[in-house]
C-alpha cells in the first residue's frame, strides 16, 4: 500500500464523520435522540460486518467503504449522544457529565489496540529477502490473503456486540427532554440561521476544529518525533504512543473530578496554556525533554473535546441537535491541520518545527475557554410603545 492509499484511510474516516453529521441531526430533530442512536449503532454493526466480504474479495476500495460506513455511524452516535448527555440534567454540570462519558472513549481505543495486536496482527514481519522468496515461489498472494482474513473474526464479533447494543437501546425507555417536548408541539425546531446568533456556539465550532487538528496532528506525527530525536526503534516509539492514550484517559477522569471545584471553562483555559508551554518545549528542545513535554500534552488535551462540546451547546434550546452536528463536523480539522504539519516537516526537515501548528491551536482554545465560551444568548426585540 503506497502513501496515497494510506492517506485515503484518513480521508474516508473524516469524510464519513463530516458528511453524515447533518443528516444525523435532521433525523434526530424529527424522530428524537433515541432513533438517531439506534441508527448509528445499526450502521456501525453493518460497517463492521462489511469487513468480512472486503477481506474475502481482497479489494482495498471495499475496505474503505466499510470504514466510511463505520465513520458515518460514529457521526450519528456523536451527534446524538453528546448533545443528549449535555441536556440530560442540570445545565451547570453538563461539562462534567460529558467528560465522564467521553472518558470511556480512550478506554475503547486502548482495548482496540490490544484486540488488534492479539487477534489481527500476526507478529510476522518479513524482510525484503523473505518477500522476494515468497514472490518467486508464487506464495506471496496466499500469504497476504491469509493475513487479511485475520480481520474477519474480530470485526464479526464487534458487529454482533454492537447490534446487541442497538437492541438494548431500542428496548430502553428514554427520559423526556425539554427541547424534544417543545419540538413535538408548535414550537420552532431550530434552524442554521438561528445558530449564528450565538457567538459562543460559532466560536465553539472553531475551537473544536482547532482542537481536533491539534490532537490528530500530534498523535499522527508523535512516532516520527520520537524516532527523529531519540532514535528509538519504531516498536518502542509505538509504546510511547499507547502511553499517550493512557494519560489521556487518566486526564479525562481527573478533569471530571476537578470540575467540582474549578469552573470547566477556567480549567480548560489553564490546561490550554499548559499545553502551549509544553509544545513550545517540544519545539525548542527536541530530544528526550521535548518527547516528554509532547507526551504530556495528551493529559492536558483530554478535557477539551467534551468541554468545548458542552460549552458550545449551552442555551441553544431547540437548536441543540443541529448545533451538535456542526460541532461534530469540526472533526474535519484533523484532515486539514495534519497535512499542514506534513508540509512544514517536508519544507524544514524538522518535526519539532511542525509542532508549531498544535501550539497555535491551543492558543485559540485558551482564548475560547477564557473569553469566547461565555454564553451570550440572543435578546428578543423590544416592542416600541407608541
Protein language model annotation of sequence segments:
Residues 42-57, 273-287:
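C-terminal ends and interior cores of transmembrane alpha-helices
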Residues 262-308:
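C-terminal transmembrane helical hairpin of 12-TM major facilitator-type secondary transporters
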Residues 112-121, 193-242:
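Extracytoplasmic gate region of multi-pass secondary transporters
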Residues 8-29, 242-254, 333:
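Central cavity-lining transmembrane alpha-helices of secondary-active solute carriers
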Residues 76-90, 302-317:
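Intracellular juxtamembrane helix-capping segments at the cytosolic ends
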Residues 59-77, 289-304:
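Hydrophobic core of transmembrane alpha-helices in multi-pass small-molecule transporters
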Residues 96-125, 325-338:
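Glycine-rich segments within core transmembrane alpha-helices of 12-TM secondary carriers
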